[in-house]
Design a protein with these regions (language model features):
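Conserved beta-strand-loop-beta-strand hairpin that lines the nucleotide-binding pocket
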Residues: 54, 59-74, 118-235
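A short acidic, amphipathic alpha-helical/loop segment
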Residues: 188, 274, 302-303
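Short acidic, S/G/P-rich loop/turn micro-motifs used as interaction or catalytic elements
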Residues: 230-231, 262-265, 292-295
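Bergerat-fold GHKL ATPase/HATPase_c domain
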Residues: 1-112, 121-124, 236-277, 281, ...
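A short acidic (Asp/Glu
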Residues: 296-301, 327-329
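Short, glycine-/small-residue-enriched flexible loop/hinge segments at domain edges that mediate gating
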Residues: 281-294
Length: 339
C-alpha cells in the first residue's frame, strides 16, 4: 500500500468510526494505524475543510460529527438475521439525516425495497451497500453475488431471453414470488429517483444515462441517484400510476425502444406481441416511442388495431412519436375505427 492509498484508508476509517468516537477519534485512529496524533489531526483538518466532518469545542473538549458530505460502504453476509430495516436504521440512516423529509422518504423506500429484493430473490451469499451524499445529490448502490435478476426472471417466467426479462421488468407487476410480492417495488423505485439503473451480467435496465460504472459480471447491482433539491414525493409518483380515487396500480409506461434487439427495426407482429405481453394487467398503457425512428405497418397494426379491438377496456396511448411513427400508428387506428 503506497502513501496515498494509506492516507485514503485512514480517512475512510475516520469517517466510519466518527460517530462511535466523537471525542477520542484522534487517539483511536492513531492507535489503530500506529501513527502520530499530529498525523491524525492533519487528516481531521482536511476532512473538515472538505465538508466531511464538522466539530465543536476546543482542546480536550472538542467533538467531531459527520459533516454535510457523507458516505458509508459495507458488505454483509446474507444470513437469516439480516433485514433491510435494521441495516438502514443501524448502519446507513445517518447518511440521510438533515435532508428534506421527501428526500429521506424516497431514499428509505428505495434502499429498503432493493435490499429486500436481494434478501428474498438473489439466492446470493453477500450484499454490498454504498450510500453517498454531496451538496447536490444522493447516490445509493446495492450489489449482490447471486444468480442475476434478469437470468432468474427468464428462467422462472419461461421467457425468450434475458432481454425480454428486462423488458417485462420495465412494465411493472412482474414478480417471481406472487404470494409475497406485488412486483411493484422496482417499478416505483425506478420512478421516484432521478436516475435508476440495474446492471446484471452485462444486461442493463436504465431510466437515464447518468451512471458510468464498469459492468457487473456477477449477481446484480442497482444504482439510484436523487437530486437534493427534488420536490418529488412517493405519493405523487404513486398517484401518477393509479387512477383518481383508486388504490390500484393500473397504469404503466412501456419504453418501446427496449423491444429492439441491436439494430433491428420494429416491423413484425411477433415483435408487437412481445411488447404486449402482460399488459392486460393494466387499464392505461402509454407506449413511449422516444428513440424509435420508424416502425412497420404490421407492428403498428398488431398493437393499435388487432389488440385494441380485442381489449376495448384497455386504453392504449402512444407518446413521444416521430412523424414516421405517428403516421403508421394513425393508419392502424383509422383502420380500427372504420370497421
Amino acid at each position: 500500500m503506497n502513501n496515498k492509498e494509506r492516507g485514503e484508508s485512514i480517512r475512510h476509517q475516520i469517517l466510519k468510526d466518527i460517530r462511535q468516537h466523537p471525542t477520542d477519534i484522534s487517539r483511536y485512529i492513531a492507535d489503530s494505524f500506529s501513527i502520530t496524533l499530529q498525523a491524525v489531526n492533519n487528516h481531521l483538518k482536511r476532512l473538515e475543510e472538505e465538508g466531511w466532518l464538522q466539530s465543536s469545542g476546543r482542546g480536550k473538549g472538542k467533538r467531531y460529527f459527520p459533516g454535510d458530505m457523507r458516505e458509508y460502504r459495507s458488505q454483509f453476509p446474507l444470513t437469516v438475521d439480516f433485514t433491510e430495516d435494521a441495516v438502514w436504521r443501524e448502519q446507513y440512516s445517518f447518511v440521510f439525516e438533515g435532508l428534506q423529509e421527501n428526500i429521506v422518504d424516497i431514499c428509505q423506500y428505495g434502499f429498503t425495497e432493493m435490499v429486500n429484493n436481494v434478501i428474498d430473490h438473489s439466492d446470493g451469499t453477500l450484499i454490498e451497500i454504498y450510500a453517498f451524499r454531496d451538496k447536490e445529490r444522493i447516490v445509493i448502490i446495492i450489489a449482490d453475488d447471486g444468480e442475476g435478476i434478469f437470468k432468474k426472471i427468464k428462467r422462472l417466467c419461461d421467457l425468450q431471453d434475458e432481454r425480454q426479462a428486462l423488458f417485462e421488468l420495465s412494465k411493472g407487476k412482474l414478480t417471481t414470488d406472487p404470494d409475497n410480492h406485488t412486483g411493484e417495488g422496482i417499478f416505483f423505485t425506478s420512478r421516484v429517483f432521478d436516475a435508476f439503473e440495474i446492471d446484471s451480467k452485462g444486461v442493463k435496465f436504465s431510466h437515464s444515462d447518468q451512471f458510468d460504472f464498469i459492468g457487473n459480471e456477477s449477481g446484480t447491482a442497482v444504482y439510484m441517484l436523487l437530486k437534493r433539491d427534488s420536490n418529488r414525493t412517493i405519493q405523487s409518483v404513486f398517484d401518477d400510476y393509479a387512477g383518481p380515487d383508486e388504490f390500484q396500480f393500473n397504469k404503466t409506461v412501456i419504453p418501446v425502444r427496449l423491444a429492439q434487439y441491436g439494430n433491428e427495426k420494429l416491423v413484425s407482429r411477433s415483435q408487437a406481441k412481445r411488447l404486449l405481453l402482460r399488459i392486460e394487467l393494466f387499464q392505461n398503457v402509454l407506449f413511449d416511442f422516444d428513440g424509435v425512428s420508424a416502425i412497420g405497418q404490421a407492428f403498428a397494426d398488431e398493437i393499435f388495431r388487432v389488440y385494441a379491438q380485442s381489449h376495448p377496456d384497455i386504453d392504449l396511448v402512444p407518446v413521444k412519436m416521430e412523424e414516421n411513427v405517428k403516421k403508421m400508428i394513425n393508419r392502424a387506428i383509422s383502420s380500427r375505427v372504420s370497421k
